[in-house]
Amino acid sequence: MGQDAFMEPFGDTLGVFQCKIYLLLFGACSGLKVTVPSHTVHGVRGQALYLPVHYGFHTPASDIQIIWLFERPHTMPKYLLGSVNKSVVPDLEYQHKFTMMPPNASLLINPLQFPDEGNYIVKVNIQGNGTLSASQKIQVTVDDPVTKPVVQIHPPSGAVEYVGNMTLTCHVEGGTRLAYQWLKNGRPVHTSSTYSFSPQNNTLHIAPVTKEDIGNYSCLVRNPVSEMESDIIMPIIYYGPYGLQVNSDKGLKVGEVFTVDLGEAILFDCSADSHPPNTYSWIRRTDNTTYIIKHGPRLEVASEKVAQKTMDYVCCAYNNITGRQDETHFTVIITSVGLEKLAQKGKSLSPLASITGISLFLIISMCLLFLWKKYQPYKVIKQKLEGRPETEYRKAQTFSGHEDALDDFGIYEFVAFPDVSGVSRIPSRSVPASDCVSGQDLHSTVYEVIQHIPAQQQDHPE
């Protein structure tokens, strides 16, 4: 590329001079400063690449000269193009590839190809009271962008924990200067006792696989101009069972003992961490004998149908891929807590029952009192007695106080006299003649009293 490291004359005002390239690169730079944003620029093959350059000075300048050189390792720098003030003098071999717009010292490379990779040197000379020079070097790399990587797993059917191994390989169709990195759950994977990598880092070996190796794996591929990440892939690892335990929806659990209320139906659930899912079996233990009562992860026990108050069970989990199994023992104790709760519930309702009973008693009493007031049963009885025939009254005898009590049946009527001390009781029989005069008033009173007794005096002999 370009001519040798000797410069041609640039105009009559500068005069004729020749020097070697390395002398130009290390010229004086007092009062002149050349800067570049980055000393390394990465370009994409087939695209344009812009190399920005800035310079400044503080002295009067009559002429500004800009020179671009290109060098590769172990080769001499080659001239690309130069300018004095606004006049550009390109190398005819590359006049359509490199572009510069003085006094701007930046360089445009279009299109960028792999041979364009190397070091680009820019030198600025200022002519005034003297000549000031400064230069910068920019390293340019050229790459193809990375295409999306694809990860393959071997064996694709999976591996058994502590028995099988697994290999993950990252494939990329396009890209240069590729750098591979493996990620697990979004974090970098490092070398360990089970992880190892190929020299290019595009292959990950896991030997042997364990449950902890389960996760989302991806391959990140990058180069100076791009990066791409593969789709997430999860290796299949068979493990377990781990952490076998039994839980229930009811009852109290203390250790391996479940306390269940009498009359409750309790559902037990047996679970363990495993892949693929386990096969569960429920075993009942009685009198040193065991027998399988059910298959599946759940068991329902109806406590009211169980004759024993204490029952022993075993839940067994088996993984048919790993060939491992585990079991857990537990005891079920049936108590009468449910009945006590029911009795307490009845006691809690007793005040309400008492109030209800008292209310019913009062209502019934009021109804009976109302019926008694309305119909008065004693009057009915009296009317029936008064309506008896006279023959029954004739049978009644006077009260003498000495006859047999069986002969005293009859109807009596007693009268209270105002003067009890002055009047003596007169029997219902006839009064002697000696007493008739003194007891006339009394007799008439007695007669009025006893006249209510039908025909009792007529039947008495005179």
UniProtKB/Swiss-Prot annotation:
GO terms for biological process: cell division; centrosome cycle. Widely expressed. It comes from the Eukaryota. GO terms for cellular component: centrosome; Golgi apparatus; Golgi membrane; intracellular membrane-bounded organelle; midbody; mitotic spindle; nucleoplasm; spindle. The keyword Glycoprotein applies. Residues 1-31 form the signal peptide. Poly-ADP-ribosylated (PARsylated) by tankyrase TNKS during late G2 and prophase, leading to translocation to mitotic centrosomes. N-glycosylated. Residues 149-233, 235-331 form the Ig-like C2-type domain. The chain crosses the membrane at residues 352-372. Disulfide bonds join C170-C219, C270-C315. Residues 373-462 are cytoplasmic. Its main location: Golgi. It is found in: Golgi apparatus membrane; Cytoplasm, Cytoskeleton, Spindle; Cytoplasm, Cytoskeleton, Microtubule organizing center, Centrosome; Midbody. Keywords: ADP-ribosylation, Cell cycle, Cell division, Cytoplasm, Cytoskeleton, Disulfide bond, Glycoprotein, Golgi apparatus, Immunoglobulin domain, Membrane, Mitosis, Repeat, Signal, Transmembrane, Transmembrane helix. It is a single-pass type I membrane protein. It holds the Pfam family Ig_3. Glycans are attached at N85, N129, N165, N320. Required during prometaphase for centrosome maturation. Following poly-ADP-ribosylation (PARsylation) by TNKS, translocates from the Golgi apparatus to mitotic centrosomes and plays a key role in the formation of robust microtubules for prompt movement of chromosomes: anchors AKAP9/CG-NAP, a scaffold protein of the gamma-tubulin ring complex and promotes centrosome maturation. This is HEPACAM family member 2. It comes from Homo sapiens. The gene is HEPACAM2.
